[in-house]
């Protein structure tokens, strides 16, 4: 019975959504937009960070491989 009261409150007599539901939907959309903005912002910085880390890894492996090659030449 409580569900029917909520349903009646959400819907007006003409079957249109009430102002409360409109505000609730607008708030949900706003939260989704804000969350998407921060997700994209963090994804962008994560890509840059991954690029820097991969470049550093390539440099380390290049240095180590050069070191091993020079050690082999000394044998």
Swiss-Prot record:
The keyword Secreted applies. It is found in: Secreted; Cell surface; Fimbrium. Keywords: Fimbrium, Secreted. A motif (QXSXEXXXL) lies at residues 16-24. InterPro entries: Class3_signal_pept_motif. It holds the Pfam family Class_IIIsignal. The keyword Secreted applies. GO terms for cellular component: cell surface; extracellular region; membrane. Residues 1-15 form a propeptide. Contains an amino terminal motif QXSXEXXXL, which is part of a class III signal sequence. This is Probable pilin MJ0431. It comes from Methanocaldococcus jannaschii (strain ATCC 43067 / DSM 2661 / JAL-1 / JCM 10045 / NBRC 100440). The lineage of its organism: Archaea, Methanobacteriati, Methanobacteriota, Methanomada group, Methanococci.
């Amino acid at each position: 019975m409580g569900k029917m009261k909520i349903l009646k409150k959400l819907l007006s007599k003409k079957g249109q959504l009430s102002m409360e539901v409109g505000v609730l939907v607008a708030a949900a959309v706003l939260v989704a937009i804000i969350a998407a903005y921060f997700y994209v912002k963090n994804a962008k910085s994560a890509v840059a960070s991954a690029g820097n880390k991969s470049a550093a890894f390539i440099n380390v492996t290049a240095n180590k491989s050069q070191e091993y090659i020079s050690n082999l030449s000394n044998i």
